Amino acid sequence: MLGSTANKEKFIETQEEEKQYPENFESWHDANADQPQFPNQIHHQTEELKSIFSKQERLAMARQEIQALKIEWQHYLQEFGTKEVTLKQRKSSSSADLLNLWNECQQFAEKEQSSSLRGIAAFIQRLKWLFFKFRSKAICKIPDKGFYKREMSLIIADFQILFYQTKYAELEVEIDTLEKELANKDAAEMARQMADTSMKYLKNQLFHTYGNNHDKPIFTLPDLRNNWREVQKEYPIILSTTFSSLSSLQRDAVYDYIIMDEASQVSVETGALALSCAKNAIIVGDTMQLPNVVTEEDKEKLNFIANACLIKPEYDCANMSFLQSICKVIPNVPQTLLREHYRCHPRIINFCNQKFYGGDLVIMTRDKGEEDVICAIRTAKGNHSRSHMNQREIDVIKEEVLPNLSYETDEIGVIAPYNKQVDAVKSALEEDIDVATVHKFQGREKDAIIMTTVDDVITSFSDDPNLLNVAVSRAKSQFYLVVSGNEQPKDCNISDLIAYIEYNNGTVSTSKIHSIFDYLYEQYTDARIAYLKKHKKISEYDSENLTFALLEDILKENINMRHLNIICHLPLYMLIQDYSLLNEEESKYAANINTHIDFLIYNRVSKQPVLAIETDGYTFHKSGTNQSERDIKKDRILELYGIPLVRLSTIGSNEKKIIR
């Protein structure tokens, strides 16, 4: 460990005492490891483990998927009621087949509404319908001839319900198959064997480098500067802080690689210093973890320098960490997401997964159906916060939360955004309970975490996304949120957490709109986009494809939109739950199966709509047409239910700017 002057002096002083080669160094030599085929053995073991790890990962994803499907199915039944479905799946069919039938049904419903089909076109449409019925009978057991004489919305609902059931059964089979395959493989033992083989190879290489009467040089302090190449040969790995990395050895010293950990907490200027002494760099960090702290005094100085020297925004030392800067300066730098998560209960970490990581994490822990894994407790309404301290929330923690926790006190943590609340909680609770701000909890974990938000109305400070991500992900087994019962802003992160908790705990929504059945409609969206790609010659489909691609690009480009997703062609009746705001004509229009939203951007955490987008063909939607009148109705309905709407014309421009 070098870096600071004190570290270097300590290294020199203790070098002779601590720098000892192993007494049995000769035993490190392994004749087998000298053989050319020995690395191939390691490669073979690695490939075997890769295969097992891949199956373990897929098993975790399947468990994650079936849990999401199960929760969504419960909400579907709560919001639409139970219904006997007479459709039965044939053994040779799959959930993908049912999605295709649903998609085709929707196309027929749209054509049916059109009065423009005449003569040969109408005849061809009838033939297509007959062929569809024949094909659907090969996929499903249709109960009777009257099945297809019903309203198309009822037929589609049957396909949706059968899809849920079929997909659930498919996932159960996949999980069972993977569990049986993995039961016959001892991954831990195979990993141990590979580690042993790799260690033999490493030790053998170290023996050839440092054994065989290799002189053990003892360096002086000036050697670190004047003889740095020899120091590097003897000590190929050097530890240092980013700030001191340049001065660990001579300033001209160059390293093959620099590995920078916790880069989200490194300042831009010190990170740049560290880069200047390496040929290659591996930057490790998480932009959704807490960034480095910059004091107000330093911010003022850094902003002055930035303005005076015309420093580009992507090098903003006052407001960005080194990791954020790297991502902006080199947006196409190769990135690897460490996807596997082993700490938290699935229901806890999946909030962070959906909110901050776009659903890309693979949750390797198991959900065994435990109760009260993630809970929110609202205090009574009122102004209970005083100077960043909230006694009412402390009382709730002491009297309602802690009695329900069965862990040892040293396995419980309380997180607060303000030091005054931390001090007050410490005074009220047992000494063994760890109470601190989020910054002091980063890198740690507890069986149970209690988060007190303090503010009567959530502020930008207590709602900071990085703070919330770290706070939630400290909890291994249970997480409690204690929050004011006052109405909170709907678009804040804490509100998303509350909505996530309520949804996953099966709370029945009292909203006038349905929660978004994203598992169902994400699958449908994939099927529809695949269908549209086969019909690019039809202009309306082409515009839908282009809009979908545009929306995907917008969401991918913005890190703050990771919690958003897109579904297409959502019927309005799947969105409107309470028709009391509508008149008779509007209700009839909203309930029509063909009244749909072209694209809906929704919050994958709260399952609530964020923005509706319509793609309007100029001729079809121009003023005075029947479609224009329907557009006015749809605009009014969405406005009544507080759902923002953007209309994009096929002859318009600046679509990306309009949507953002």
Question: At which residue positions do the language-model features occur?
Answer:
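Nucleic-acid endo/exonuclease domains
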Residues: 512-660
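A short beta-strand element within the Helicase C-terminal
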Residues: 253-259, 444-455, 470, 478-481
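Conserved helicase/translocase motor-coupling segment
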Residues: 358-428
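Long, amphipathic, heptad-repeat alpha-helical coiled-coil stalk/linker regions
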Residues: 1-160
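Conserved helicase NTPase catalytic core signature
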Residues: 61, 70, 106-254
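ASCE P-loop NTPase helicase motor core
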Residues: 1, 20, 121-140, 144, ...
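Conserved motor-coupling elements within RecA-like helicase/translocase cores
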Residues: 226-235, 435-456
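Helicase C-terminal subdomain and adjacent C-terminal extension
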Residues: 297-336, 458-558
